[in-house]
Amino acid sequence: MANTQAVETQAVTDTASVGEKNALRKAHDYLNYTAFSYTGLIGQLEYEGFTTEEATYAVDNCGADWFEQAEKKAADYLNYSAFSYTGLIGQLEYEGFTTEEATRAADNCGADWNEQAVKKAKEYLDYSSFSRSGLISQLKYEGFTTEQAEYGVTQNGL
Protein backbone atom coordinates (compact mmCIF):
# COMPACT_ATOMS: atom_id res chain seq x y z
CA MET A 1 0.00 0.00 0.00
CA ALA A 2 2.82 2.43 0.82
CA ASN A 3 4.32 1.84 -2.63
CA THR A 4 0.98 2.58 -4.27
CA GLN A 5 0.66 5.80 -2.28
CA ALA A 6 4.23 6.79 -3.18
CA VAL A 7 3.52 6.18 -6.87
CA GLU A 8 0.29 8.20 -6.64
CA THR A 9 2.09 11.02 -4.82
CA GLN A 10 4.85 10.99 -7.44
CA ALA A 11 2.28 11.13 -10.24
CA VAL A 12 0.55 14.06 -8.56
CA THR A 13 3.76 16.02 -8.00
CA ASP A 14 5.03 15.32 -11.52
CA THR A 15 2.23 17.46 -12.93
CA ALA A 16 2.37 20.13 -10.22
CA SER A 17 3.75 23.60 -10.73
CA VAL A 18 6.78 24.74 -8.75
CA GLY A 19 4.50 26.80 -6.50
CA GLU A 20 2.26 23.80 -5.85
CA LYS A 21 5.25 21.58 -5.04
CA ASN A 22 6.63 24.20 -2.65
CA ALA A 23 3.23 24.59 -1.00
CA LEU A 24 3.00 20.82 -0.61
CA ARG A 25 6.43 20.68 1.05
CA LYS A 26 5.44 23.52 3.37
CA ALA A 27 2.15 21.75 4.21
CA HIS A 28 4.10 18.63 5.19
CA ASP A 29 6.45 20.77 7.31
CA TYR A 30 3.50 22.30 9.16
CA LEU A 31 1.80 18.94 9.70
CA ASN A 32 5.03 17.54 11.15
CA TYR A 33 5.01 20.42 13.64
CA THR A 34 1.37 20.73 14.70
CA ALA A 35 -2.20 19.78 13.84
CA PHE A 36 -4.32 21.72 11.36
CA SER A 37 -7.80 21.56 9.93
CA TYR A 38 -8.21 21.48 6.17
CA THR A 39 -9.24 25.14 6.03
CA GLY A 40 -6.75 26.13 8.70
CA LEU A 41 -3.85 24.71 6.72
CA ILE A 42 -5.00 26.43 3.54
CA GLY A 43 -5.18 29.70 5.47
CA GLN A 44 -1.71 29.20 6.92
CA LEU A 45 -0.23 28.50 3.50
CA GLU A 46 -1.95 31.59 2.08
CA TYR A 47 -0.51 33.60 4.98
CA GLU A 48 2.91 32.30 3.90
CA GLY A 49 2.28 33.84 0.47
CA PHE A 50 1.07 30.88 -1.53
CA THR A 51 -1.89 31.49 -3.81
CA THR A 52 -5.25 29.98 -2.93
CA GLU A 53 -4.79 27.53 -5.80
CA GLU A 54 -1.32 26.46 -4.62
CA ALA A 55 -2.46 26.14 -1.01
CA THR A 56 -5.56 24.16 -1.96
CA TYR A 57 -3.50 21.86 -4.17
CA ALA A 58 -1.08 21.23 -1.30
CA VAL A 59 -3.79 20.53 1.25
CA ASP A 60 -5.71 18.30 -1.17
CA ASN A 61 -2.56 16.27 -1.80
CA CYS A 62 -0.77 16.25 1.56
CA GLY A 63 -2.34 12.98 2.67
CA ALA A 64 -3.58 14.28 6.03
CA ASP A 65 -6.29 12.42 7.91
CA TRP A 66 -8.44 15.33 9.10
CA PHE A 67 -10.06 13.25 11.85
CA GLU A 68 -6.60 12.44 13.17
CA GLN A 69 -5.62 16.09 12.91
CA ALA A 70 -8.70 17.05 14.95
CA GLU A 71 -7.78 14.49 17.61
CA LYS A 72 -4.22 15.83 17.80
CA LYS A 73 -5.49 19.41 18.07
CA ALA A 74 -7.93 18.39 20.82
CA ALA A 75 -5.07 16.78 22.76
CA ASP A 76 -2.98 19.94 22.28
CA TYR A 77 -5.76 22.10 23.69
CA LEU A 78 -6.36 19.82 26.65
CA ASN A 79 -2.64 19.88 27.47
CA TYR A 80 -2.72 23.60 28.23
CA SER A 81 -6.30 24.47 29.11
CA ALA A 82 -9.51 22.91 30.39
CA PHE A 83 -12.58 22.54 28.20
CA SER A 84 -16.08 21.19 28.46
CA TYR A 85 -17.15 18.67 25.85
CA THR A 86 -19.15 21.28 23.96
CA GLY A 87 -16.49 23.91 24.51
CA LEU A 88 -13.84 21.69 22.95
CA ILE A 89 -16.05 20.95 19.97
CA GLY A 90 -16.69 24.68 19.54
CA GLN A 91 -12.99 25.49 19.71
CA LEU A 92 -12.16 22.84 17.12
CA GLU A 93 -14.91 24.14 14.84
CA TYR A 94 -13.51 27.65 15.28
CA GLU A 95 -10.15 26.25 14.09
CA GLY A 96 -11.88 25.06 10.92
CA PHE A 97 -12.63 21.45 11.69
CA THR A 98 -16.01 20.16 10.58
CA THR A 99 -18.63 19.37 13.21
CA GLU A 100 -18.10 15.67 12.49
CA GLU A 101 -14.32 15.93 12.91
CA ALA A 102 -14.63 18.02 16.07
CA THR A 103 -17.25 15.77 17.65
CA ARG A 104 -15.26 12.63 16.94
CA ALA A 105 -12.16 14.25 18.42
CA ALA A 106 -14.04 15.19 21.60
CA ASP A 107 -15.52 11.70 21.78
CA ASN A 108 -12.11 10.06 21.42
CA CYS A 109 -9.83 12.42 23.36
CA GLY A 110 -10.15 10.48 26.61
CA ALA A 111 -11.00 13.54 28.68
CA ASP A 112 -12.65 13.14 32.06
CA TRP A 113 -15.15 15.99 31.81
CA ASN A 114 -15.55 16.17 35.60
CA GLU A 115 -11.80 16.70 35.92
CA GLN A 116 -11.91 19.26 33.13
CA ALA A 117 -14.53 21.13 35.19
CA VAL A 118 -12.20 20.99 38.22
CA LYS A 119 -9.34 22.42 36.14
CA LYS A 120 -11.50 25.12 34.53
CA ALA A 121 -12.86 26.16 37.94
CA LYS A 122 -9.28 26.42 39.23
CA GLU A 123 -8.31 28.52 36.20
CA TYR A 124 -11.09 30.97 37.05
CA LEU A 125 -10.27 31.01 40.76
CA ASP A 126 -6.60 31.70 40.01
CA TYR A 127 -7.58 35.01 38.37
CA SER A 128 -10.77 36.11 40.08
CA SER A 129 -13.05 35.61 43.07
CA PHE A 130 -16.34 33.79 42.68
CA SER A 131 -19.20 32.68 44.85
CA ARG A 132 -20.13 29.01 44.58
CA SER A 133 -23.24 29.80 42.52
CA GLY A 134 -21.38 32.33 40.38
CA LEU A 135 -18.67 29.85 39.47
CA ILE A 136 -21.21 27.12 38.75
CA SER A 137 -23.00 29.54 36.42
CA GLN A 138 -19.72 30.42 34.70
CA LEU A 139 -18.84 26.76 34.17
CA LYS A 140 -22.31 26.05 32.78
CA TYR A 141 -21.83 29.00 30.43
CA GLU A 142 -18.58 27.30 29.30
CA GLY A 143 -20.61 24.22 28.37
CA PHE A 144 -20.24 22.02 31.43
CA THR A 145 -23.33 20.20 32.65
CA THR A 146 -24.79 21.21 36.00
CA GLU A 147 -23.36 18.04 37.54
CA GLN A 148 -19.89 18.67 36.11
CA ALA A 149 -19.95 22.32 37.18
CA GLU A 150 -21.01 21.43 40.72
CA TYR A 151 -18.31 18.76 40.90
CA GLY A 152 -15.65 21.18 39.66
CA VAL A 153 -16.61 23.86 42.13
CA THR A 154 -16.86 21.44 45.06
CA GLN A 155 -13.42 19.99 44.30
CA ASN A 156 -12.04 23.52 44.48
CA GLY A 157 -13.41 24.06 47.96
CA LEU A 158 -16.51 26.13 47.23
Describe the residue ranges of each PLM region.
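An alpha-helical, amphipathic repeat domain used for nucleic-acid recognition
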Residues: Q5-L158
